[in-house]
C-alpha cells in the first residue's frame, strides 16, 4: 500500500508539478545579455558589449584533445570569434596543447598578426546543427586592445548559406516577421545578387521595412559587406545640422554606421558645446575616441541626439542619449572612430543596433531595418505578444495540473473506498471467526 501511494504521488502530482514549474521558469526567464560572465570575468564587459548585439555566445570544441572554448558566432560574417591567450578570459584556445594544430602561414599587418592554421573543430548551432571540421583554415587576429582575439574562418558555415540569428528571433518574435536572416556568402561573385534597390514606397509598406542596397569593399585581409544609405542631412540635438548630403554605410559585420569624415568638424563642435571629455588613442593610424562622463553628468548629455534624414525618400533614423551612450562601471561611453590616415570616414559603434535591427527577407531577397519599440529593446525583455502567449500557455498548464489533481483525488477516493470495504469485510470475518471461536469454547466447557 505504501509503495502504491508513493508511486501515485510521484507520477500524478510531483512530476507534473515539477515539469510545469520548469516550463513556467523558461517562459519567465529574462534573456540576460550578460550571461557571459559565467564564461568570462567581469573585466571583459566592454569587449562583450561591443560584439553582443549582432552575435551570440556559444561553445565549441577545438583541438585534440578537445578544448571547450566559449565564443561569439557572427551570423553576418559567417565567422566565429573565440578567446585567445591574449584576452583576459577564464578559458582560451591554446594551440600548443593540440596535436592536430598545423600552422599554414603567418603575416604581419602593422600591429595585427594574422595566422592561418588548421585544427579540429566541432560546435553545435541552433541546437540542431553541428559542424565537424578538420584541416580547416582559421584566421587569428591579435590586436593591442584585445577587442578581437581570434576569428575563425569567414566561410565557416558554407558558401551562400543563410544563417538564422537566434538572438533576434528569441527576443523579438513579431507576428509579421517569421523568417528573417542577415548572413551572406562572402564570395565576390555573388555580390551582384545582393544589389537590391531601395524600396521607395515606404508609406505603403505594411511590415515597416526600410530597405537599402548593398555595396562592398575589401582590404588585404578579408572582404566586407556593407549596406549603403544616402542622407540629406544629419541633425544633432535638433539644432546643429550637418546639411551636406552624404552616404552612410551600415556595416553588418560589426554593427557600425560609417560616414563622411566631414562630420568630424561638426562633431568637434558638439564636444566643445557640451564640454565633453574625450580620450583619444592613436592606434595604427586610426584614432579611437572614447567619450565619457561621470554619472553626475547625465543631465548635461540628456538632450544629446542624432537624426539621419532623407527628405525625398521620407526615412530617418534617430539615436538619442539612451541609444548612444552605455554604462560600463562608473563611466558613460560613446565610441567614435576616425581614420586619421585617409580622412575618409567616421564610424559609430554598436549603439545603433540597440534601436534598429538588421533583417533579411529570405522570400523577397531584401535586407532592411526594423525599429525596436521601447518595450522590446535589447534589454532581455520579451515581446508583449509573446507575453500574451506565455499567459495562455501557463493558464492551460495550470488547468491541466488542477485536472490531474482532481483525477488523482477521485481515483484515490475510489481506491480508498474499495480498500475500506475490503478492510471492513476482513474485520467482519475476523469478528465472526472470533464469535465462532468464543461459542466453541463455551460449548466445550
Q: How should each PLM-predicted stretch be described?
A:
Residues 2-21:
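Cleavable N-terminal signal peptides of Sec/SRP-targeted secreted and luminal proteins
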Residues 21-51, 122-242, 331-337:
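Aspartyl protease catalytic domain
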Residues 21-34, 137-144, 197-200, 243, ...:
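Aspartic protease catalytic domain
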Residues 37-42, 51-147:
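Signature of the N-terminal lobe/flap region of pepsin-like aspartyl proteases
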Residues 57, 112, 118, 231, ...:
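Surface-exposed or flexible loop/turn and strand-edge residues in extracellular/cell-surface modules
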Residues 60-62, 70-75, 80-82, 151, ...:
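Short hydrophobic beta-strand that contains or immediately precedes a catalytic carboxylate
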Residues 68, 72-100, 255-283, 413-415:
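Classical protein tyrosine phosphatase
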Residues 239-252, 256, 265-266, 305:
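Extended serine/threonine-enriched, polar tracts that run as long, contiguous segments within proteins
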Amino acid at each position: 500500500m505504501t509503495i502504491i501511494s508513493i508511486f501515485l504521488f510521484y507520477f500524478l502530482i510531483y512530476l507534473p508539478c515539477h515539469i510545469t514549474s520548469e516550463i513556467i521558469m523558461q517562459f519567465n526567464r529574462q534573456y540576460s545579455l550578460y550571461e557571459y560572465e559565467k564564461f568570462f570575468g567581469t573585466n571583459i564587459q566592454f569587449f562583450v558589449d561591443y560584439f553582443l548585439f549582432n552575435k551570440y555566445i556559444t561553445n565549441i570544441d577545438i583541438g585534440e584533445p578537445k578544448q571547450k572554448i566559449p565564443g561569439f558566432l557572427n551570423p553576418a560574417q559567417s565567422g566565429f570569434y573565440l578567446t585567445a591567450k591574449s584576452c583576459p578570459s577564464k578559458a582560451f584556445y591554446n594551440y600548443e596543447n593540440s596535436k592536430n594544430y598545423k600552422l599554414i602561414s603567418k603575416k604581419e599587418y602593422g600591429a595585427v598578426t594574422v595566422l592561418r592554421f588548421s585544427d579540429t573543430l566541432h560546435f553545435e548551432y541552433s541546437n540542431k546543427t553541428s559542424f565537424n571540421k578538420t584541416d580547416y583554415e582559421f584566421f587569428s587576429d591579435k590586436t593591442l586592445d584585445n577587442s578581437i582575439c581570434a576569428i575563425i574562418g569567414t566561410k565557416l558555415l558554407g558558401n551562400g548559406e543563410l544563417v538564422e540569428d537566434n538572438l533576434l528571433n528569441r527576443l523579438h518574435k513579431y507576428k509579421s516577421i517569421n523568417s528573417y536572416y542577415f548572413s551572406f556568402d562572402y564570395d565576390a561573385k555573388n555580390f551582384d545578387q545582393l544589389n537590391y534597390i531601395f524600396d521607395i514606397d515606404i508609406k505603403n509598406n505594411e511590415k515597416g521595412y526600410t530597405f537599402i542596397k548593398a555595396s562592398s569593399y575589401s582590404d588585404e585581409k578579408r572582404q566586407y559587406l556593407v549596406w549603403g544609405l544616402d542622407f540629406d542631412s544629419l541633425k544633432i540635438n535638433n539644432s546643429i545640422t550637418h546639411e551636406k548630403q552624404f552616404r552612410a554605410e551600415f556595416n553588418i559585420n560589426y554593427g557600425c554606421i560609417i560616414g563622411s569624415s566631414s562630420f568630424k568638424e561638426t562633431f568637434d563642435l558638439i564636444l566643445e558645446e557640451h564640454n565633453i571629455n574625450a580620450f583619444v588613442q592613436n592606434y595604427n593610424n586610426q584614432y579611437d575616441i572614447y567619450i565619457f562622463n561621470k554619472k553626475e553628468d547625465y543631465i548635461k548629455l540628456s538632450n544629446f541626439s542624432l537624426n539621419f534624414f532623407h527628405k525625398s525618400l521620407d526615412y530617418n533614423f534617430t539615436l538619442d542619449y539612451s541609444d548612444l551612450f552605455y554604462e560600463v562601471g562608473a563611466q558613460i561611453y560613446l565610441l567614435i572612430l576616425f581614420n586619421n590616415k585617409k580622412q575618409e570616414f567616421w564610424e559609430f559603434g554598436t549603439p545603433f543596433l540597440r534601436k534598429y535591427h538588421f533583417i533579411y527577407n529570405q522570400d523577397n531577397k531584401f535586407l532592411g531595418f526594423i525599429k525596436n519599440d521601447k518595450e522590446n529593446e535589447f534589454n532581455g525583455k520579451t515581446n508583449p505578444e509573446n507575453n500574451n502567449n506565455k499567459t495562455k500557455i501557463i493558464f492551460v498548464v495550470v488547468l491541466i495540473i488542477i485536472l490531474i489533481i482532481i483525477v488523482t483525488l477521485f481515483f484515490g477516493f475510489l481506491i480508498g473506498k474499495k480498500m475500506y470495504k475490503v478492510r471492513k469485510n476482513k474485520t467482519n470475518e475476523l469478528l465472526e471467526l472470533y464469535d465462532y471461536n468464543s461459542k466453541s469454547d463455551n460449548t466445550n466447557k
